[in-house]
């Protein structure tokens, strides 16, 4: 079931957090046990790009950035994804021409524009499928907490607007596992954006002694936005972040509609949005991820004044992706050497 994250997750003090804390202790113990178990190993370098919390953090454009750089370096990258929100069961290699978001999920379909993508709840099986296709580098989209595949390097992405939320483990807060466990198993953190919420992230990550990197999301629709008035709608992890980005590009956001993450818009939803925009002489605005789901609707052709906002990651360190990939390969070679010594 696709739901929105509760508002109290992002507040320091809440009665609901207090009420759910005993349940979060149990969930935290279970997630810790999952994370420290022995992992299946594949004979390919594996970079995991995950996050600490439930809800969107900006992983998808980061995975895309790594896929692009990996190809520039001569790799044939393959992306392992859960295919969240899609109906397909078992392992499936995405065909962008024939698959749609209802079958394989919106994120996986976006990623398939840039690399081979295999979806499965078992990431080891998905990685094996990519190996059969000739891929020589695995980019794991999420999966840090579920621990279904050994990873040579784990990069965790944090949305600076939300940080770690109230710092509690699900369901009392947004954390997918205790911070102590996640910190011990990660390799570095990528903080996207800047806000007051990120100060705590910087403090806590710095205390671990592990690397903290910085980046910003850059809209690719900037030339189309200035001076226009919008009805903006989105079904993503943090719709307010999208609405704010339009304003930062000198667009005027008159109306907003927020839907649950990975929401599939009905024909009625879209007709209502089109009608509202026409009545108020507004442009429609949505995200590239939302648009992959809109493409399954019969009303898509009626979305005349629609601007689709895609984003890319602007890393503070220009050669960031190359640097991380070099570290991944170094660890992979070390892993192979140790294996050969033992066997």
From Swiss-Prot:
Disulphide connectivity of cysteines: none
Organism per entry: Bartonella quintana (strain Toulouse)
Pathway in which the depicted protein is active: Glycolipid biosynthesis; lipid IV(A) biosynthesis; lipid IV(A) from (3R)-3-hydroxytetradecanoyl-[acyl-carrier-protein] and UDP-N-acetyl-alpha-D-glucosamine: step 6/6
Classification via InterPro entries: LpxK (IPR003758), P-loop_NTPase (IPR027417)
Enzyme Commission numbers on file: 2.7.1.130
Coiled-coil stretches: none
Residues involved in ATP binding: 53-60
Protein name: Tetraacyldisaccharide 4'-kinase
Keywords in alphabetical order: ATP-binding, Kinase, Lipid A biosynthesis, Lipid biosynthesis, Lipid metabolism, Nucleotide-binding, Transferase
Reaction(s) catalysed (UniProt annotation): a lipid A disaccharide + ATP = a lipid IVA + ADP + H(+)
Keyword Acetylation found: no
SUPFAM superfamilies cross-referenced by the UniProt entry: P-loop containing nucleoside triphosphate hydrolases
Gene Ontology cellular component list: plasma membrane
Family indicated by similarity: Belongs to the LpxK family.
Function: Transfers the gamma-phosphate of ATP to the 4'-position of a tetraacyldisaccharide 1-phosphate intermediate (termed DS-1-P) to form tetraacyldisaccharide 1,4'-bis-phosphate (lipid IVA).
GO function terms (MF aspect): ATP binding; tetraacyldisaccharide 4'-kinase activity
HAMAP family: LpxK
Biological process per Gene Ontology, one example term: lipopolysaccharide core region biosynthetic process
